[in-house]
């Protein structure tokens, strides 16, 4: 399983590919919607790409609980 640092780096790459945001902007405390301006459609693409990259399943009902980058890192690490 990937370390939390590896998960964060992987998520930053995925967010960069989807939104064009610099990977340095994707920090654990950042909110996907408020800080990174990621809409629901982009978020679903990010989730699908994260599932593929990390070999996990993130149920649709869990996606709404992934408010911050850290929430996503913690979920993936614990999956």
Curated annotation (Swiss-Prot):
Residues 2-79 form the Carrier domain. It comes from Myxococcus xanthus. InterPro entries: ACP (IPR003231), ACP-like_sf (IPR036736), PP-bd_ACP (IPR009081). The modification O-(pantetheine 4'-phosphoryl)serine is found at residue 40. GO terms for cellular component: cytosol; membrane. 4'-phosphopantetheine is transferred from CoA to a specific serine of apo-ACP by AcpS. This modification is essential for activity because fatty acids are bound in thioester linkage to the sulfhydryl of the prosthetic group. Pfam families: PP-binding. Belongs to the acyl carrier protein (ACP) family. Keywords: Cytoplasm, Fatty acid biosynthesis, Fatty acid metabolism, Lipid biosynthesis, Lipid metabolism, Phosphopantetheine, Phosphoprotein. Carrier of the growing fatty acid chain in fatty acid biosynthesis. The keyword Kinase does not apply. Pathway: Lipid metabolism; fatty acid biosynthesis. It comes from the Bacteria. This is Acyl carrier protein. It is found in: Cytoplasm. GO terms for molecular function: acyl binding; acyl carrier activity. The lineage of its organism: Bacteria, Pseudomonadati, Myxococcota, Myxococcia, Myxococcales. GO terms for biological process: lipid A biosynthetic process. Gene3D superfamilies: ACP-like.
């Amino acid at each position: 399983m990937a370390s939390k640092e590896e998960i964060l780096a992987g998520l930053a790459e995925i967010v960069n590919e989807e939104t064009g945001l610099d990977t340095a902007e994707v920090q654990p405390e950042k909110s996907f919607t408020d800080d990174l301006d990621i809409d629901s459609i982009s978020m679903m693409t990010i989730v699908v790409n994260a599932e593929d990259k990390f070999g996990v399943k993130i149920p649709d009902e869990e996606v709404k609980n992934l408010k911050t980058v850290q929430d996503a890192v913690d979920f993936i690490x614990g999956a």
